[in-house]
A protein has these predicted regions:
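TM-loop-TM module centered on a large, flexible mid-protein loop between adjacent transmembrane helices
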Residues: 133-180, 198-199, 215-225, 231-238
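Membrane-interface loop-to-helix entry segments
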Residues: 15-59, 69, 119-123, 233-241
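Inter-helical loop and helix-membrane interface segments of multi-pass membrane transporters/permeases
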Residues: 1-18, 25, 29-32, 60-85, ...
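Membrane-water interface regions at transmembrane-helix termini and the short interhelical loops
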Residues: 19-42, 101-111, 187-196, 217-229
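Hydrophobic alpha-helical segments and their helix-loop junctions in multi-pass secondary transporters
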Residues: 45-72, 94, 134-143, 245-257
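Helix-loop-helix connectors at the membrane interface of multi-pass transporters/channels
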Residues: 1-12, 107, 124, 181-209, ...
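Transmembrane alpha-helical segments of multi-pass small-molecule transport proteins
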Residues: 2-29, 44-53, 87-102, 166-171, ...
Length: 267
């Protein structure tokens, strides 16, 4: 009814992409207060729903036994390390952008203790739990459906209940929305606003970021998972690692952890 689509994607997929893009921009235009509200309730909601999915996977796969009995796909440690090391580097690159711009969020902390706990305890713990649940669910799909399903959209398509599908898709939207805005929009929006404060506001910076995001054609990156991980993520992690090294050396060695607060706000 909507045509055959273009660039390898259906018309409905393009409409979904544009609607989601517009939702991101709308939240940014409402400011940091709405963003903070979204982040505060999105994380526990997604955690609860993912835990429910883990419970389903555990029951459908008849417990942990079949999951732990699965054999490794690697013949030896040499083949394992060839995949593990670049994959680990890719994940470091994935989080490098947020780590460099963490002050965009920690500045709202009411004390050093709050931001320290958030970065050293809360963030690593929640990411480990989410990653572990993702591995568990994907492993369970191998037992349940005979093949690993890592894409939550494809997994949801296996369900029969319209209610379950609706709740699951809403959870996917909330999870993607909260992560995308916090990790990919806030920091560059602040960068544009701070670079040209007379001409660009935070809202305008968010709009510029959204336009650049479309021009980068992210659907091409995701079309090839191997290229996305081993070329894109591993490639730019080297550049961001260098920037991170400069920031660490400047703060700990050059400035001895002492900053002039007035200099931080000069434009």
């Amino acid at each position: 009814m909507l045509g055959g689509g273009f660039l390898g994607h259906t018309t409905t997929e393009w409409l979904s992409f544009l609607l989601f893009w517009g939702l991101n921009i709308a939240i940014i235009y409402k400011g940091m207060n709405l963003l903070r509200l979204v982040e505060n309730w999105a994380a526990p909601f997604v955690l609860v729903m993912t835990a429910a999915l883990v419970g389903w996977a555990y029951d459908a796969a008849d417990g942990m036994g079949p999951l732990l009995a699965q054999k490794s796909r690697f013949a030896d440690f040499d083949s394992f390390w060839k995949v593990f090391v670049p994959s680990l580097t890719g994940m470091v690159g994935f989080w490098a952008t947020l780590s460099l711009n963490m002050p965009d969020f920690t500045r709202f902390g009411r004390s050093q203790r709050e931001q320290a706990i958030g970065q050293t305890v809360a963030l690593p713990t929640t990411m480990f739990v989410f990653a572990a649940m993702g591995v568990f669910i994907t492993s369970a799909t191998t037992v349940i459906y005979g093949q690993p399903i890592w894409d939550p959209i494809k997994l949801v398509a296996k369900f029969d209940s319209p209610v379950v599908i609706a709740i699951s898709m809403f959870t996917v939207v909330v999870a993607t929305l909260s992560v995308n805005i916090a990790a990919n929009v806030v920091s560059p929006a602040n960068d544009f606003a701070n670079a040209f404060p007379r001409f660009i506001s935070f809202k305008t910076g968010g709009l510029i970021t959204g336009i650049l995001g479309i021009l980068m054609q992210p659907w091409r990156l995701l079309a090839d998972p191997s290229g996305y991980i081993f070329t894109w993520l591993v490639g730019y992690s080297g550049g961001l690692g260098s920037i991170g090294g400069v920031l660490i050396a400047d703060y700990w060695i050059v400035r001895r952890t002492r900053l002039n607060l007035e200099d931080l706000y000069l434009t």
